Amino acid sequence: MPPRPRFDRRAPVRELPNINDRISYPQLRVVDSDGSQLGVISREEALEVAKERELDLVLVSEKADPPVCRIMDYGKFKFEQEKKAKEAKKKSHQTEVKEVKMRYKIDQHDYDVRIGQAVRFLKAGDKVKCTVIFRGREIQHTALAETLLRRMAKDLEEKAEIQQAPKREGRNMIMFLTPRKTPLVKKEEKEAAPTKAVRTIPAPPRPTAAKVAAQQA
């Protein structure tokens, strides 16, 4: 029997960035940290300039002739690149419609579970379809189902707003919630907000009878 093939379990080699001493090209076109051109200089001279600035020499265009390097704070540059990548990934998230199903006679524990599910969906930027399922003659209790859905909307009002009010859909009653774009300001917070004080100017004192008589004399 031929030997079984072995799988290479070694961790993949992580590609290191081409910065500072890892740059091997003898001649480089260097851009300074302020964007000015330092021209084509030797690798050693470029490293010395970066060292004087207490910055890094980073290879930004290896295919150019000669290769182009820039003097910069590589740690800060890497942080900004990762931040941009996260923002781009967040923007590329396609909104989905997630569904939360329940019965109109749901108990408190199961209701809390459905609330937790809805919160997770909303935080992920997805819309939530809240569905109350009727079986048999339960269809006559649409009023109770609507009350339940509006209760759910109220409990989630800090994170969601109603996109579509409760309505019948076949043998079910549904409601759509969408993530709230602006934070909700509660009524109590509005009432507690300090009002801008209005400066009042006191009226001048009225002259006494004695003072009036003295002025007429």
From Swiss-Prot:
InterPro entries: T_IF-3_C_sf (IPR036788), T_IF-3_N_sf (IPR036787), Translation_initiation_fac3_CS (IPR019813), Translation_initiation_fac_3 (IPR001288), Translation_initiation_fac_3_C (IPR019815), Translation_initiation_fac_3_N (IPR019814)
Function of the protein: IF-3 binds to the 30S ribosomal subunit and shifts the equilibrium between 70S ribosomes and their 50S and 30S subunits in favor of the free subunits, thus enhancing the availability of 30S subunits on which protein synthesis initiation begins.
The entry's keywords: Cytoplasm, Initiation factor, Protein biosynthesis
PANTHER family xrefs: TRANSLATION INITIATION FACTOR IF-3, TRANSLATION INITIATION FACTOR IF-3, MITOCHONDRIAL
GO annotation terms (biological process): ribosome disassembly
Assigned GO CC terms: cytosol; membrane
Positions of region (Disordered): 179-217
Localisation per UniProt entry: Cytoplasm
Domain of life: Bacteria
Any matching Pfam family: IF3_C
Subunit structure, interactors included: Monomer.
GO terms for MF: ribosome binding; translation initiation factor activity
Protein name per Swiss-Prot or TrEMBL: Translation initiation factor IF-3
Source species taxonomy: Bacteria, Bacillati, Cyanobacteriota, Cyanophyceae, Synechococcales
Record-stated family: Belongs to the IF-3 family.
